């Protein structure tokens, strides 16, 4: 993913003639954007992560990976889960106009606690030093921002609410128990934390399910507009 994005960024820079660009990554797009920023820091103005696995990995990934080692049911259960997640990834690719190969098992490994710790050891810029603090606002000349949600069941018409209602059970008993169904509140912290408790689940954060978000919460589109203005006012 990182190398794919790096090539895309280099193409955009070449076509647009821009000196630097702003990167914004959701979910696994967070470490992907951070990787590109580490590779070409002089061409990146800012990195913003939304519901990203940054400070720590996802208990959901940990649980699925640990279940894969169970006797009898482990292998078939993991196969089923990866097929479902691959299908979901393909659906996202379809609605976003991209069609790329999916490897959800590799994604789970990278999103796990061990995978995230290994990634952060190589690419620490913007990661908080404390369990639930903020990271460096500026690192290698790049502005760092993040936001995330702590909603799970936000709209009864949204079919992903059922999935996140189940995945959120993986956070029971965890210190970082507040979550968006996939990522813990503190785990999402990176650079300047704009907010970490929007009443949004993991798909609400990018308005993925055709606007099926909570009617009582901030409109996700408004959050992105505000951030675009924030970057503009910062001269980015």
Task: Say what each PLM segment does.
Residues 23, 117-123, 170-175:
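Short linear motifs at secondary-structure transitions and domain/linker junctions
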Residues 89-156:
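Serine-hydrolase catalytic core
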Residues 129-236:
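C-terminal catalytic-base region of ester-bond hydrolases, centering on the histidine
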Residues 61, 82, 109, 120, ...:
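Generic detector of well-ordered alpha-helical segments enriched in charged/polar residues
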Residues 30, 39, 109, 123, ...:
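Generic alpha-helical secondary structure signal
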Residues 69-71, 93, 97, 124, ...:
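Short, flexible coil/linker elements and helix-boundary hinge sites characteristic
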Residues 1-5, 220-223:
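Phosphate/oxyanion-binding active-site loops and adjacent basic polyanion-contact surfaces
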Residues 2-115, 180:
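Serine-dependent carboxylesterase/thioesterase catalytic core
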């Amino acid at each position: 993913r990182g190398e794919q994005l790096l090539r895309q960024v280099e193409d955009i820079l070449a076509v647009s003639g821009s000196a630097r660009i702003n990167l914004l990554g959701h979910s696994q797009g967070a470490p992907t954007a951070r990787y590109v920023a580490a590779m070409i820091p002089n061409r990146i103005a800012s990195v913003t992560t939304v519901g990203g696995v940054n400070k720590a990995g996802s208990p959901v990934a940990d649980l699925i990976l640990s279940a894969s080692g169970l006797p009898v049911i482990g292998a078939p259960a993991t196969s089923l889960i990866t097929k479902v997640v691959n299908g979901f990834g393909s659906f996202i690719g379809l609605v976003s106009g991209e069609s790329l190969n999916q490897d959800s098992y590799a994604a789970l490994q990278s999103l796990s606690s061990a995978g995230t710790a290994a990634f952060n050891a190589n690419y620490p810029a913007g990661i908080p030093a404390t369990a639930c603090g903020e990271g460096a606002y500026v690192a290698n000349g790049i502005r760092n921002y993040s936001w995330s949600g702590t909603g799970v069941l936000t709209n009864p018409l949204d079919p992903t609410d059922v999935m996140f209602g189940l995945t959120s059970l993986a956070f029971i008993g965890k210190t970082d128990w507040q979550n968006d169904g996939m990522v813990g509140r503190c785990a999402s912290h990176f650079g300047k934390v704009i907010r970490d408790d929007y009443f949004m689940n993991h798909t609400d954060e990018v308005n993925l399910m055709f606007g099926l978000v909570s009617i009582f919460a901030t409109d996700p589109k408004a959050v992105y507009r505000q951030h675009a203005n924030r970057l503009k006012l910062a001269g980015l």
